[in-house]
Amino acid sequence: MSLFDWFADRRKGQYVGNVKQEPEEGDGLWSKCPECGLVVYLKDLRLNASVCAGCGYHHRIDSSERLALIADPESFQPLNEHLAPIDPLGFKDRRAYADRLRESQSATGLNDGVVTGLCRVDGIGMGLAVMDFRFMGGSMGSVVGEKITRLVEECTKRKLPLLIVCASGGARMQEGMLSLMQMAKISGALERHREAELLYLPLLTHPTTGGVTASFAMLGDLILAEPKALIGFAGRRVIEQTLREKLPDNFQTAEYLQDHGFVDTIIPRTQFRSTLASLLRLHGSKSLELTNA
Protein backbone atom coordinates (compact mmCIF):
# COMPACT_ATOMS: atom_id res chain seq x y z
CA MET A 1 0.00 0.00 0.00
CA SER A 2 1.34 3.36 -1.02
CA LEU A 3 1.44 6.35 1.30
CA PHE A 4 -1.30 8.05 -0.76
CA ASP A 5 -3.57 5.00 -0.41
CA TRP A 6 -2.99 5.00 3.34
CA PHE A 7 -4.09 8.65 3.64
CA ALA A 8 -7.13 7.96 1.43
CA ASP A 9 -8.24 5.12 3.70
CA ARG A 10 -7.78 7.32 6.74
CA ARG A 11 -10.00 10.03 5.24
CA LYS A 12 -12.76 7.54 4.43
CA GLY A 13 -12.94 6.44 8.06
CA GLN A 14 -13.30 9.93 9.45
CA TYR A 15 -16.64 11.60 10.15
CA VAL A 16 -16.40 15.34 9.62
CA GLY A 17 -19.34 16.02 11.93
CA ASN A 18 -17.29 14.89 14.91
CA VAL A 19 -14.78 17.68 14.43
CA LYS A 20 -15.25 20.20 17.23
CA GLN A 21 -14.83 23.83 16.27
CA GLU A 22 -12.99 25.80 18.91
CA PRO A 23 -14.47 29.20 19.78
CA GLU A 24 -12.67 32.29 18.61
CA GLU A 25 -10.26 33.51 21.25
CA GLY A 26 -11.54 37.07 21.03
CA ASP A 27 -15.29 36.32 21.18
CA GLY A 28 -16.93 38.56 23.78
CA LEU A 29 -13.64 40.18 24.78
CA TRP A 30 -13.62 43.28 22.59
CA SER A 31 -16.00 46.10 21.74
CA LYS A 32 -15.89 48.45 18.76
CA CYS A 33 -17.11 52.00 19.26
CA PRO A 34 -19.88 52.80 16.71
CA GLU A 35 -18.88 56.47 16.80
CA CYS A 36 -15.10 56.49 16.25
CA GLY A 37 -14.36 52.82 15.49
CA LEU A 38 -11.96 52.38 18.42
CA VAL A 39 -11.62 48.72 19.44
CA VAL A 40 -11.44 48.42 23.22
CA TYR A 41 -10.96 45.53 25.61
CA LEU A 42 -14.46 44.98 27.01
CA LYS A 43 -13.24 44.84 30.60
CA ASP A 44 -11.51 48.22 30.21
CA LEU A 45 -14.65 49.69 28.63
CA ARG A 46 -16.76 48.64 31.62
CA LEU A 47 -14.18 50.03 34.03
CA ASN A 48 -14.77 53.38 32.31
CA ALA A 49 -18.56 53.16 32.82
CA SER A 50 -19.00 51.91 29.22
CA VAL A 51 -17.84 55.27 27.86
CA CYS A 52 -15.44 55.25 24.89
CA ALA A 53 -12.02 56.56 25.93
CA GLY A 54 -11.41 57.83 22.40
CA CYS A 55 -14.47 59.96 21.66
CA GLY A 56 -16.63 59.88 24.79
CA TYR A 57 -19.43 57.86 23.16
CA HIS A 58 -21.81 56.49 25.81
CA HIS A 59 -22.59 52.84 25.12
CA ARG A 60 -26.01 51.64 26.19
CA ILE A 61 -25.98 49.83 29.55
CA ASP A 62 -28.59 47.71 31.32
CA SER A 63 -30.30 48.38 34.63
CA SER A 64 -27.90 46.28 36.73
CA GLU A 65 -24.88 48.14 35.35
CA ARG A 66 -26.61 51.46 35.96
CA LEU A 67 -27.42 50.57 39.56
CA ALA A 68 -23.80 49.61 40.19
CA LEU A 69 -22.64 52.98 38.84
CA ILE A 70 -25.02 55.05 40.98
CA ALA A 71 -25.76 53.34 44.30
CA ASP A 72 -23.31 52.74 47.13
CA PRO A 73 -22.18 49.08 47.20
CA GLU A 74 -24.79 46.74 48.71
CA SER A 75 -27.11 49.64 49.57
CA PHE A 76 -29.85 49.09 46.97
CA GLN A 77 -33.10 47.73 48.40
CA PRO A 78 -35.51 46.76 45.58
CA LEU A 79 -39.22 47.48 45.91
CA ASN A 80 -42.20 45.71 44.31
CA GLU A 81 -40.11 43.13 42.46
CA HIS A 82 -43.09 40.77 42.34
CA LEU A 83 -45.20 43.02 40.08
CA ALA A 84 -45.49 41.54 36.58
CA PRO A 85 -47.52 42.61 33.54
CA ILE A 86 -50.52 40.78 32.13
CA ASP A 87 -52.22 40.99 28.74
CA PRO A 88 -55.53 42.75 29.52
CA LEU A 89 -56.46 43.36 25.88
CA GLY A 90 -55.33 40.02 24.45
CA PHE A 91 -53.29 42.15 22.07
CA LYS A 92 -51.74 40.62 18.98
CA ASP A 93 -49.97 42.27 16.04
CA ARG A 94 -47.38 40.21 14.17
CA ARG A 95 -46.89 38.37 17.47
CA ALA A 96 -48.94 38.03 20.63
CA TYR A 97 -48.15 40.50 23.41
CA ALA A 98 -47.95 37.60 25.88
CA ASP A 99 -45.20 36.02 23.77
CA ARG A 100 -43.27 39.29 23.64
CA LEU A 101 -43.48 39.56 27.42
CA ARG A 102 -42.18 36.04 27.97
CA GLU A 103 -39.33 36.64 25.54
CA SER A 104 -38.27 39.90 27.22
CA GLN A 105 -38.53 38.38 30.69
CA SER A 106 -36.37 35.46 29.63
CA ALA A 107 -33.77 37.67 27.94
CA THR A 108 -33.45 40.24 30.73
CA GLY A 109 -34.31 38.37 33.91
CA LEU A 110 -36.72 41.20 34.78
CA ASN A 111 -40.49 41.14 35.25
CA ASP A 112 -40.88 44.43 33.39
CA GLY A 113 -38.95 47.40 32.07
CA VAL A 114 -38.04 49.24 35.29
CA VAL A 115 -36.18 48.46 38.51
CA THR A 116 -37.18 50.53 41.54
CA GLY A 117 -35.93 50.74 45.11
CA LEU A 118 -34.17 52.71 47.81
CA CYS A 119 -30.42 53.21 48.00
CA ARG A 120 -27.65 55.43 49.28
CA VAL A 121 -25.38 57.63 47.20
CA ASP A 122 -22.27 58.61 49.13
CA GLY A 123 -24.22 57.79 52.28
CA ILE A 124 -27.27 59.86 51.34
CA GLY A 125 -30.58 58.01 51.21
CA MET A 126 -32.76 58.36 48.12
CA GLY A 127 -35.26 56.62 45.86
CA LEU A 128 -34.02 55.26 42.54
CA ALA A 129 -35.82 53.99 39.44
CA VAL A 130 -33.88 52.69 36.45
CA MET A 131 -35.63 51.93 33.17
CA ASP A 132 -34.17 49.10 31.09
CA PHE A 133 -34.35 49.57 27.31
CA ARG A 134 -33.77 45.85 26.70
CA PHE A 135 -37.31 45.12 27.90
CA MET A 136 -39.55 45.95 24.94
CA GLY A 137 -37.69 49.17 24.26
CA GLY A 138 -38.17 50.39 27.83
CA SER A 139 -41.83 50.99 27.02
CA MET A 140 -44.11 52.16 29.83
CA GLY A 141 -46.98 49.82 30.60
CA SER A 142 -49.22 49.55 33.65
CA VAL A 143 -46.59 47.75 35.76
CA VAL A 144 -43.84 50.24 34.91
CA GLY A 145 -46.20 53.07 35.83
CA GLU A 146 -47.33 51.38 39.03
CA LYS A 147 -43.79 50.63 40.22
CA ILE A 148 -42.64 54.20 39.60
CA THR A 149 -45.76 55.63 41.28
CA ARG A 150 -45.28 53.44 44.35
CA LEU A 151 -41.63 54.51 44.55
CA VAL A 152 -42.57 58.20 44.35
CA GLU A 153 -45.15 57.71 47.11
CA GLU A 154 -42.62 55.86 49.27
CA CYS A 155 -40.12 58.69 48.83
CA THR A 156 -42.80 61.23 49.77
CA LYS A 157 -43.64 59.22 52.88
CA ARG A 158 -39.98 58.87 53.92
CA LYS A 159 -39.03 62.44 52.93
CA LEU A 160 -36.45 61.20 50.42
CA PRO A 161 -35.13 62.72 47.19
CA LEU A 162 -35.76 60.78 44.00
CA LEU A 163 -33.86 59.95 40.82
CA ILE A 164 -35.46 58.33 37.77
CA VAL A 165 -33.14 57.16 35.00
CA CYS A 166 -35.19 57.35 31.80
CA ALA A 167 -34.58 55.13 28.76
CA SER A 168 -37.77 54.47 26.85
CA GLY A 169 -39.52 54.43 23.52
CA GLY A 170 -42.68 55.74 25.19
CA ALA A 171 -46.02 54.28 26.25
CA ARG A 172 -46.56 50.57 25.52
CA MET A 173 -49.08 50.37 22.70
CA GLN A 174 -50.03 46.75 23.53
CA GLU A 175 -51.78 47.99 26.70
CA GLY A 176 -53.68 50.84 25.06
CA MET A 177 -55.27 53.36 27.42
CA LEU A 178 -53.91 51.50 30.46
CA SER A 179 -50.41 52.56 29.45
CA LEU A 180 -51.37 56.14 28.60
CA MET A 181 -52.99 56.73 31.99
CA GLN A 182 -49.63 56.01 33.67
CA MET A 183 -48.46 59.42 32.45
CA ALA A 184 -51.07 61.20 34.57
CA LYS A 185 -50.72 58.81 37.50
CA ILE A 186 -46.96 59.28 37.84
CA SER A 187 -47.27 63.04 37.28
CA GLY A 188 -49.82 63.28 40.09
CA ALA A 189 -47.56 61.39 42.49
CA LEU A 190 -44.65 63.65 41.56
CA GLU A 191 -46.76 66.74 42.26
CA ARG A 192 -47.40 65.49 45.81
CA HIS A 193 -43.66 64.81 46.15
CA ARG A 194 -42.99 68.40 45.01
CA GLU A 195 -45.55 69.82 47.44
CA ALA A 196 -43.59 68.11 50.23
CA GLU A 197 -40.58 70.20 49.09
CA LEU A 198 -38.56 67.14 48.09
CA LEU A 199 -36.01 66.92 45.29
CA TYR A 200 -36.79 65.05 42.06
CA LEU A 201 -34.13 64.54 39.40
CA PRO A 202 -34.77 62.79 36.07
CA LEU A 203 -31.73 61.60 34.11
CA LEU A 204 -32.50 61.42 30.39
CA THR A 205 -30.42 58.75 28.65
CA HIS A 206 -30.42 57.50 25.07
CA PRO A 207 -33.22 57.26 24.03
CA THR A 208 -35.96 59.05 25.99
CA THR A 209 -39.04 59.54 23.81
CA GLY A 210 -42.82 59.43 23.57
CA GLY A 211 -45.06 59.36 26.62
CA VAL A 212 -42.12 59.22 29.04
CA THR A 213 -40.78 62.51 27.68
CA ALA A 214 -44.29 63.96 27.78
CA SER A 215 -44.69 63.16 31.48
CA PHE A 216 -42.24 62.42 34.29
CA ALA A 217 -39.02 62.84 32.28
CA MET A 218 -39.61 66.60 32.06
CA LEU A 219 -41.01 67.28 35.53
CA GLY A 220 -37.77 67.42 37.50
CA ASP A 221 -36.47 70.24 39.67
CA LEU A 222 -33.33 69.88 37.57
CA ILE A 223 -33.43 67.98 34.29
CA LEU A 224 -30.22 66.04 33.73
CA ALA A 225 -29.08 64.28 30.56
CA GLU A 226 -26.23 62.16 29.24
CA PRO A 227 -24.17 63.47 26.31
CA LYS A 228 -25.74 63.06 22.85
CA ALA A 229 -28.82 61.30 24.22
CA LEU A 230 -31.82 61.24 21.86
CA ILE A 231 -34.65 63.08 23.62
CA GLY A 232 -37.99 63.89 22.04
CA PHE A 233 -41.67 63.12 21.69
CA ALA A 234 -42.47 62.31 18.06
CA GLY A 235 -39.90 60.91 15.67
CA ARG A 236 -37.75 63.12 13.49
CA ARG A 237 -39.33 61.90 10.25
CA VAL A 238 -42.87 62.53 11.52
CA ILE A 239 -41.98 66.10 12.49
CA GLU A 240 -40.30 66.83 9.16
CA GLN A 241 -43.29 65.51 7.22
CA THR A 242 -45.70 67.52 9.38
CA LEU A 243 -43.77 70.80 9.22
CA ARG A 244 -42.46 70.17 5.70
CA GLU A 245 -39.11 71.50 6.83
CA LYS A 246 -35.64 70.01 7.19
CA LEU A 247 -34.59 69.78 10.84
CA PRO A 248 -31.07 70.54 12.15
CA ASP A 249 -28.68 67.60 12.29
CA ASN A 250 -28.43 67.80 16.08
CA PHE A 251 -32.19 68.12 16.58
CA GLN A 252 -33.54 66.13 19.58
CA THR A 253 -30.08 65.63 21.08
CA ALA A 254 -29.30 66.50 24.69
CA GLU A 255 -27.06 69.34 23.52
CA TYR A 256 -29.78 70.85 21.32
CA LEU A 257 -32.31 70.69 24.16
CA GLN A 258 -29.86 72.29 26.58
CA ASP A 259 -29.25 75.15 24.15
CA HIS A 260 -33.03 75.71 23.95
CA GLY A 261 -33.70 75.52 27.69
CA PHE A 262 -35.29 72.08 27.97
CA VAL A 263 -32.34 70.40 29.72
CA ASP A 264 -30.54 72.02 32.65
CA THR A 265 -27.21 70.23 32.49
CA ILE A 266 -25.45 67.42 30.64
CA ILE A 267 -23.35 65.13 32.82
CA PRO A 268 -20.89 62.54 31.47
CA ARG A 269 -21.56 59.12 32.94
CA THR A 270 -18.12 58.92 34.52
CA GLN A 271 -18.90 62.06 36.56
CA PHE A 272 -22.54 61.38 37.34
CA ARG A 273 -22.26 59.76 40.76
CA SER A 274 -20.10 62.51 42.26
CA THR A 275 -22.28 65.21 40.68
CA LEU A 276 -25.43 63.55 42.01
CA ALA A 277 -23.99 63.43 45.54
CA SER A 278 -23.15 67.15 45.31
CA LEU A 279 -26.69 67.99 44.15
CA LEU A 280 -28.20 65.98 47.00
CA ARG A 281 -26.07 67.79 49.57
CA LEU A 282 -26.83 71.15 47.99
CA HIS A 283 -30.51 70.41 48.41
CA GLY A 284 -29.97 69.58 52.08
CA SER A 285 -30.33 65.79 51.88
CA LYS A 286 -28.61 64.04 54.76
CA SER A 287 -26.92 60.70 55.30
CA LEU A 288 -29.25 58.16 56.87
CA GLU A 289 -29.96 54.49 57.33
CA LEU A 290 -32.81 53.60 54.99
CA THR A 291 -34.11 50.84 57.24
CA ASN A 292 -34.71 53.42 59.99
CA ALA A 293 -36.17 56.11 57.73
Swiss-Prot record:
The cellular location(s) given in this protein's UniProt record come to: Cytoplasm
Q: In which pathway does it act?
A: Lipid metabolism; malonyl-CoA biosynthesis; malonyl-CoA from acetyl-CoA: step 1/1
- Catalysed conversion reaction: N(6)-carboxybiotinyl-L-lysyl-[protein] + acetyl-CoA = N(6)-biotinyl-L-lysyl-[protein] + malonyl-CoA
State the EC number(s): 2.1.3.15
Q: Give all residue intervals belonging to the CoA carboxyltransferase N-terminal domain.
A: 29-293
Q: Where do the zinc-finger regions (C4-type) map?
A: 33-55
- Per UniProt, which keywords does this protein have? ATP-binding, Cytoplasm, Fatty acid biosynthesis, Fatty acid metabolism, Lipid biosynthesis, Lipid metabolism, Metal-binding, Nucleotide-binding, Transferase, Zinc, Zinc-finger
Select a single GO molecular function from the record's annotations and give it.
Answer: carboxyl- or carbamoyltransferase activity
- Enumerate the residues binding Zn(2+): 33, 36, 52, 55
GO cellular component terms, A-Z? acetyl-CoA carboxylase complex
Q: What class of enzyme is it?
A: transferase
Q: A biological process (GO) annotation for this entry?
A: malonyl-CoA biosynthetic process
Q: Which family does it belong to?
A: Belongs to the AccD/PCCB family.
PANTHER family associated with the record: ACETYL-COENZYME A CARBOXYLASE CARBOXYL TRANSFERASE SUBUNIT BETA, CHLOROPLASTIC (PTHR42995:SF5)
Functional summary from the UniProt entry: Component of the acetyl coenzyme A carboxylase (ACC) complex. Biotin carboxylase (BC) catalyzes the carboxylation of biotin on its carrier protein (BCCP) and then the CO(2) group is transferred by the transcarboxylase to acetyl-CoA to form malonyl-CoA.
Subunit: Acetyl-CoA carboxylase is a heterohexamer composed of biotin carboxyl carrier protein (AccB), biotin carboxylase (AccC) and two subunits each of ACCase subunit alpha (AccA) and ACCase subunit beta (AccD).
Concerning HAMAP family, the annotation shows:
AcetylCoA_CT_beta
Which protein, by its recorded name, is this? Acetyl-coenzyme A carboxylase carboxyl transferase subunit beta
The species this protein belongs to is Synechococcus sp. (strain CC9902)
What does the organism's lineage look like at the top? Bacteria, Bacillati, Cyanobacteriota, Cyanophyceae, Synechococcales
In the UniProt record, the gene name given for this protein reads accD
